[in-house]
Each structure stands twice: as structure tokens, then as C-alpha cells.
Amino acid sequence: MLYEILYSLSDYISGLNVFKYITFRTMLAILTSFFFTFIIAPPCIRWLKKLSLTQHIRDDGPKTHLKKEGTPTMGGIIITASVLVAVLMWGNLKNHYMWIMIISFLGFGLIGFIDDYLKITRKNYKGLPGRYKLFAQLLLASSVTLFLYFNPKDPYTTVLSIPFFKQWLIDLGIFYLPFAIFVIVGSSNAVNLTDGMDGLAAGLVGIASIVNAVLLYISGHAVFAKYLYVLYIPGTGELAVFCGAMLGACLGFLWYNSYPAEVFMGDVGSLSLGGALGSLAVITKHEIVLALVGGIFVVEALSVILQVGYFKLTNGKRIFRMAPLHHHFELKKWPEPKVIVRFWIIGIILALLSLLTLKLR
């Protein structure tokens, strides 16, 4: 919106040419979403408290979490608003990929909002029945995937790119559709499962957003993409602005969500952020890199799958003391801040390894 105005004026005012650069607008998106989050969070937290939109803590969870009862939740509304403001201000709204991301982000956020609202009003942790939530996620992910599948401007619609190799491409054909849907829905739920400690998910999503911004910028830049043997997909570079908005919003939210949290993002935040990461990976064909940079998310989700499966097969036995994995370490007497910081450290290392894939080709 603001970008369009400034861009049109750049022909008359030479100093405004700087707004043509994606890198500059990405930085502005980071700052805009950060300060917007920082400013609106306090009144929003008070508003959530006033409406009694507070967290219900499970009785079978770690006992240290019982003191969090009554903490405002649904703070993901703050993140959603901040990302939208920054994207609408500094993003190129004529770019169709940008609109795909906005729809995906808002769609998963809406599913999370309904889930959170039902949890609060029913005063339990179940919320939206699993089959309905999964159906809504599959429907939204299918819409995103089908739009990309029938996009005539994308020459790599059904291609899976293998990192570490020079343009090793596998054309999955029609089978790419269920794969892409799995990536988007899986990413959304994996971030949701990781959001069980103060600041854990926000910090890891922020780290992943940095890597995604770099990958997107390169994918949308013909020269850099050719030099680094990355698939060149015109128009995807603009999504670096979206990643910048996510990073700024996560940093601003961390100010209030870090231990001890003043507010939780809830499913409205975790599902929208996870869905966005999955959608970004599918758009740029970096699905495998997403599994690397989001390694913590993958492990957290796998820990739940293994725990549930093993529990059913062995009639009540467990692999972990509790799943997701971060609760396992909590029950091993690791202080919550230590678990969070150590997972962040692993996330940073995985982010660096993900960026290394650009040169190891």
C-alpha cells in the first residue's frame, strides 16, 4: 500500500528509489512489525485479561506449569495484526505469491482462533475436534497447493529440489499435490506442538524466518539463483518482505512471551506461523530445507507420533516421560529457561546448516 505510493513517486523524487529494493523493504517490514507488536501488545494483554481469555492448564502436564493458569492466551492475534500491517505497508500487493501467503496465514490463524476460543469457553484443552481441525487445514492447504499447481508462471510446479546437489530435481508429477499438502499441514501442526514453553515457538519461528528470507531473495533473483544453483522462480523474492514481517512480529512478541510469559500466542499464532513456513517452502521448492531449519519442529512432532503409537502398541508404555519432547526434559528436572535456550541454540545451528546447503552444491 505505502510501497505502491512511494514507488509511483520515485520517478519524480530520486531518493525514493530505495523503496524499489526488496532488501530495504524487508528491513522496514522487520522494524514495522516489531514496533507495532511492541506498542499494541500491552493494551491487547489487558484486553485479553478483561475478557477472561486466559490459558487453561492441563492437570496431567508438568506441575511447574500450574502457576501459568490464568495467563492471557490468543496473543497470536497480535502477531497476525503486526505481520499484516507490515506486509500491507511494504509488500508489493500486485505479486500473486504475496496474496497466497496472506490467505494461508490468515486461514490457519482463523482455524487456530476458533480452536482457542472453544478451549476457553469450554474451559478445557480440547477445543475444536481433531477431525474438524484437520479437515479445515487440509482444505486450506489443498487450496494453496492447487493454486500453485495451476500457476502457468511457475515452471517447477511439481518438482522436488534436493539440497547439497547441483539442481538435482525430482518431478513427482501429480503426487506432488499430496506431498505439498502434507508439508503445509505438517508444518502448521509441528509449530503448534512446539508452542508449549514460554517463547520457544516464537524464537524458533524467528530463526526460520531469517533463513527463509535469504532463500526467497535468492530464489527470486536470477543472477544469485544461477550462481548458487537454486531454482529461479520469478516473483518469490518479494516474499522476503513477508518473512521480515514474521521475524519482527516474533521478536516483538518475545518481549512479552519470554519466560515468565505475560501472554501466550495460542493456536491462532502457532498454526498461522507454522502454516506460513510450510507455504513458503512449497512455493520456493525448499521443502527439504524446511525440515532441516525446522528440525526442532520435526523432532517435536515425531516425539508425539512415536509416543502415541508406542503407547497403543504396548498397552500403556511410553518412550518419553511426556511428549512433546520439551516436556520430557522438563520432567527430567531441566529448568524451563534452559530447555528453551538450548532448543534455540540447536535451531540456530540448524539454520546455519541450512544456509550451508547453498554452497554445498
From Swiss-Prot:
It comes from Thermodesulfovibrio yellowstonii (strain ATCC 51303 / DSM 11347 / YP87). The chain crosses the membrane at residues 28-48, 73-93, 98-118, 132-152, 168-188, 199-219, 235-255, 263-283, 288-308, 338-358. It is an enzyme of class 2 (transferase). Its EC number is 2.7.8.13. The gene is mraY. Keywords: Cell cycle, Cell division, Cell inner membrane, Cell membrane, Cell shape, Cell wall biogenesis/degradation, Magnesium, Membrane, Metal-binding, Peptidoglycan synthesis, Transferase, Transmembrane, Transmembrane helix. Pathway: Cell wall biogenesis; peptidoglycan biosynthesis. Belongs to the glycosyltransferase 4 family. MraY subfamily. Catalyzes the initial step of the lipid cycle reactions in the biosynthesis of the cell wall peptidoglycan: transfers peptidoglycan precursor phospho-MurNAc-pentapeptide from UDP-MurNAc-pentapeptide onto the lipid carrier undecaprenyl phosphate, yielding undecaprenyl-pyrophosphoryl-MurNAc-pentapeptide, known as lipid I. GO terms for molecular function: metal ion binding; phospho-N-acetylmuramoyl-pentapeptide-transferase activity; phosphotransferase activity, for other substituted phosphate groups; UDP-N-acetylmuramoyl-L-alanyl-D-glutamyl-meso-2,6-diaminopimelyl-D-alanyl-D-alanine:undecaprenyl-phosphate transferase activity. It catalyses: UDP-N-acetyl-alpha-D-muramoyl-L-alanyl-gamma-D-glutamyl-meso-2,6-diaminopimeloyl-D-alanyl-D-alanine + di-trans,octa-cis-undecaprenyl phosphate = di-trans,octa-cis-undecaprenyl diphospho-N-acetyl-alpha-D-muramoyl-L-alanyl-D-glutamyl-meso-2,6-diaminopimeloyl-D-alanyl-D-alanine + UMP. Its cofactor is Mg(2+). It is a multi-pass membrane protein. This is Phospho-N-acetylmuramoyl-pentapeptide-transferase. Coiled coil: none annotated.
